């Protein structure tokens, strides 16, 4: 056994230390994989939260546009175009939010993350409001269509008095709008109503799928129990019914 320069003897490494280093090197990839998996799950959760929030914003915008439609007594093509654009984007974002939420929800009888429960409830409420606002917009456009047809059948005469140079008697000129001026606009409004009806069916089907895929503790609740939520996740056991929910609605 050789002596060290400072007078101490070099001790050989023990077998225990060698084996411990080997275990540590084996665990490092597992820890890195676990950390990366947690990061991916967090990114997926953040993406889902962002998508649901975007859909929430679009529903609020669509509601404001429907209110504006109701405040106008005449048809406004530019407002209808904005409402159509918002509605189409809202349907696409709703589908994306559903797919993102299903991807992170996990098994029905596993541990339920409170944030996932909150997103399920938020998306359900947004879809219900979205369908309601689309129904309102369809009814309002229908009323405008009936109002337009009534005006077409009984147009108000817009008389303009002009003087004929060859006569001393003033002549009345009818400048009322002809019913032939409106068919194109009328057809566009009818097409908008049909598109809204189609989008409503799509969103109703999506709402049905969302309710079917919700975590079981959420399925077993009525609407009044949504106000009594516990802040901790629960693990559902098979063939057992929970009396309370397992998430916070407010973020």
From Swiss-Prot:
Job description of the protein: Regulator of G protein-coupled receptor (GPCR) signaling. Regulatory subunit of the R7-Gbeta5 complexes that acts by controlling the subcellular location of the R7-Gbeta5 complexes. When palmitoylated, it targets the R7-Gbeta5 complexes to the plasma membrane, leading to inhibit G protein alpha subunits. When it is unpalmitoylated, the R7-Gbeta5 complexes undergo a nuclear/cytoplasmic shuttling.
InterPro entries: RGS7BP/RGS9BP (IPR026512)
Compartmental location: Nucleus; Cytoplasm; Cell membrane
Bilayer topology: Lipid-anchor
Protein name, entry field: Regulator of G-protein signaling 7-binding protein B
Gene: rgs7bpb
Tagged with keyword Cell cycle: no
Similarity section: Belongs to the RGS7BP/RGS9BP family.
GO biological process: G protein-coupled receptor signaling pathway; negative regulation of signal transduction
Domain of life: Eukaryota
Keyword set, alphabetical order: Cell membrane, Cytoplasm, Lipoprotein, Membrane, Nucleus, Palmitate, Signal transduction inhibitor
S-palmitoyl cysteine: lipidated positions: 246-247
Species per Swiss-Prot/TrEMBL record: Danio rerio (Zebrafish)
Keyword Amino-acid biosynthesis appears in the UniProt entry: no
